[in-house]
Amino acid sequence: MKEMRNLTILLALLFSFFVVGNVDARHYKSKRKATTHRVVKKKKHVRKRRVIVRPPTIHENPYLQCEDTCSHVHGIDLSHYQGDVFWETVGENTRTAYVYLKATEGGDRIDDRYERNIDLAHRHGLKVGSYHFFRPRTDLTQQMKNFRAQCLPGEQDLIPMLDVESTGGLSNEEFCDSLSKFLLMMEEVYHQKPLIYTGRNFYNKHLLGMVDDYLLMIAMYTDEEPVLADERDICLWQYTGRGRINGVVGHVDKSRFMGQHGLRELRFRH
C-alpha cells in the first residue's frame, strides 16, 4: 500500500513538471516570435527635382565661339601681337566678315605687321579697316601725320577707327579737349567720321556726352550685351579678347554688330 502511494505521488510530480514545461516552452516561442518580428518601414515618397541643363557660354567653354551660337555679323581686330597670320585660312571662315588692323600708335609707332596684314587680308576677300591707338598727351599733329602715312584711303574698305583707352594722366577736361581736336583732324583728313573703340567702363567715366555724333565699338567681356550709362546706341560689341580662329595662333579680339547695325554703316566713302 505504501509503495502504491509513493508511485502515485511520483506520477503526479512528473505530470506537473510536464505541464509546466509545455507552458514555458509555448511562452518562450511566443516571446521569440514577438521579438524577431520584422518591421517594414513605409517608404517615403521622394519628389524628383527637375534639372534644367543650360548650354555653356563662350566664356565657360573656350572651344565655343560666339559666331557658333548666333546669326550676327562677326569680325576681328589684329596687330603685331598675333604674329604671322595665315590669311588664306582666315579668309575661308565665312563667319568672319571684317577685320580692323592696327596701323599706328602715338606720334611715331608703326605696327610692323600692318603692311603685310592689309595686303593679304584684301587678297583673301576680307573687308578691312585700320585703327590708331590714341595717346592724349602726344602732339596731335604728329599723331595725325603718323596715321595718315600708313592708313592710305585707297586701301580702306571701312572707316578708320580710333582706339581710346587712356586719359594719359590728363584731367577729364584736358583729355576730352585733346580727343575732340583729334577726332576733327581725322574727319578733315578722311572726309568721314571715324569709329571710336573704347571700353564700357572707360566710356561711362570719361566720355559721356562727348562723342554723341560718332559710332561706337564697345569692349566688354561678358555674356551680356553692353549697356552704357546714357543708354546710347552701340554699333559694335567686342565681346572677347580670348577668341580663337583658324589661321591665327593664340587669342584674338572678336566683335560683332549690335541690333540692326551692319557693314554698310562702316563703308569707307571714296
Regions found by a protein language model. Name each.
Residues 20-25:
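Sec/Tat signal peptide C-region and signal peptidase I cleavage site
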Residues 108, 137, 203, 225, ...:
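Flexible, glycine-rich phosphate/dinucleotide-binding loops
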Residues 27-97, 102-104:
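Boundary/entry segment of secreted carbohydrate-active catalytic domains
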Residues 10-18:
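Bacterial N-terminal signal peptides
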Residues 62, 68-83, 91, 101-183, ...:
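Substrate-binding cleft of extracellular glycoside hydrolase catalytic domains
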Residues 1-9:
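Bacterial N-terminal signal peptides that target proteins for export
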Residues 158-231:
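Catalytic domains of cell-wall/extracellular-matrix polysaccharide-remodeling enzymes
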Residues 53-75, 211-270:
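Functionally critical loop-and-helix segments that line ligand-binding/catalytic clefts
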